[in-house]
Amino acid sequence: CASAESLRLRPNSLNAEKRLSTAKYCSSTFVGTSNVYLAMKNNLIPTGTQAHEYIMCVGQGNHKHNPAYSNWYAMESWVKEYGILNGTALTDTITTDCFLRDFNLTYATLFSGVRHDSGDPYEWGEKIIKHYKDLGIDPQTKTLLFSDSLNFKKADEIFRYFRGKAKVAFGIGTYISNDTDVEPLNIVMKVTKCNGQDVAKLSDVEGKGMCKNPEYVEYLQRCINWRMGNE
């Protein structure tokens, strides 16, 4: 089990920086931070995954692309850039079910694992493990990285459930870096246009989608529904 702090969207905080500077001495399970500046300053490993914005822009920012294939365009471009050092793929930008249509043997082999960021983590994990097995890949060689509104208790429960089934890692942000007595706001930053064109994140659960144009969301969903029903 490994954990990393996800601080890319957090305000400047002396407390967060202090925690980062001491965490590396506390436990071997702390592997780094997604804040590149703090990683450099505190001699930590900069670690993270793809952002939703990357998949949204690469897959939907070109009007010639069918947005239901956003994950394919994103993974194809990523692999061309990084070769065999591709890290962790993000699954839920236009739903995990659609992602798995493009997560073929090549990509499943080249990426070291996948990231959960919405929906039921246990259902998602079992679905991913089955997909690896269907492709003939041993899921114990791959990483399931969980990053959806985690605290230590949730992370421990997930780890105990998937231990022995796959490698397990966690990206824990708000709970570690903004653990005040005030309930945190549910705020995220996402791109809404690329090249003058609407783009959207759908997610695996209601309430985590992002787009300013409901007509584009409807169009994207129609494209996905057609693909899921005809391929």
Task: Describe the function of each predicted region.
Residues 1-127, 132, 157, 162, ...:
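Buried, small/hydrophobic-residue-enriched core segments of structured protein domains
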Residues 96, 119-142, 147-231:
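Gly/Ser/Thr/Ala-enriched C-terminal appendages of enzymes
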